[in-house]
Amino acid sequence: MAAAPLSYEIRLARDAQEIRASQRLRYAVFVEELGGAGPLIDHENRLEADEFDPLYDHLVLIDATKPEEDLDRVVAAYRLLRSDRAAEIGRFYCDAEYDLTPLRASGRRLLELGRSCVHPDHRGGAAMLMLWNALADYVLAHEIEILFGVASFHGTDVAALQQPLAWLHHHHLAPEGLRPRARQFQRMDLVAKEALDRRAALDAMPNLIKAYLRLGGFVGEGAFVDRPFNTTDVMLLMDTQAMSEKHREFYTRRVEGRG
């Protein structure tokens, strides 16, 4: 896996304990910080879990200064599912929110990304870049051609999100042949293109979404309002074969240390 600073280790989770540690981080971010809910959330043990966890690879960034039994040692995480594995399971997580027929029909190697999170104490540094580095290794190892997954705006007040949603629709809509559509369709073109406020749109855009856009990413058609999780979701896609050399260099840029 990718290199990381000396106090960190980054790898795929090796056992149930490391998956539980990623679930502890997800609880801190998605439940305590963002107010999400779900049927399998364990409030007593502070774990955010669902039925998909045993089926996915879990990419985890570990604070190596903490003991192995400490569930707070995972400080950043991603959840990954390849299309060959999804074919065995019968579905992706995103199937509940978006019609993925165009992606499946493409015949290309897919990777679903989800549950991306970074502990508040580790934001603004190298943690997200470390995840991207390790993700790049995974993509190359499995010859992935398209990455996709839902990314979230905090809250379900679509009117308050009309500028960033409309900006995504007008400037970053995926090619029609690769464009998933939201099942419970929420229009994103809530502001006419000529009435967009670029600064307001980008200021309201989550950093993860902006990172995908910098790498040449696209969005699907329509948003999905996830009331139990207290988010408004958009579908992000990235075609690794269509990435420019500039984007590819950013995506695979290394950070010094060990992994």
From Swiss-Prot:
Effect of a null allele: Mutant lacking this gene is unable to produce ornithine lipids.
Residue ranges the record marks as coiled coil: none
GO BP terms in the entry: lipid metabolic process
Keywords recorded for this protein, A-Z: Acyltransferase, Lipid biosynthesis, Lipid metabolism, Transferase
Substrates-to-products reaction catalysed: a (3R)-hydroxyacyl-[ACP] + L-ornithine = a lyso-ornithine lipid + holo-[ACP] + H(+)
Keyword Cytoplasm found: no
InterPro entries: Acyl_CoA_acyltransferase, Ornithine_N-alpha-AT
MF GO annotations: ornithine-acyl [acyl carrier protein] N-acyltransferase activity
Gene3D superfamilies per record: 3.40.630.30
EC number: 2.3.2.30
Pathway: Lipid metabolism
Biological role stated in the UniProt entry: Catalyzes the first step in the biosynthesis of ornithine lipids, which are phosphorus-free membrane lipids. Catalyzes the 3-hydroxyacyl-acyl carrier protein-dependent acylation of ornithine to form lyso-ornithine lipid (LOL).
Family membership: Belongs to the acetyltransferase family. OlsB subfamily.
Name of this protein: L-ornithine N(alpha)-acyltransferase
Source organism of this protein record: Rhodobacter capsulatus (strain ATCC BAA-309 / NBRC 16581 / SB1003)
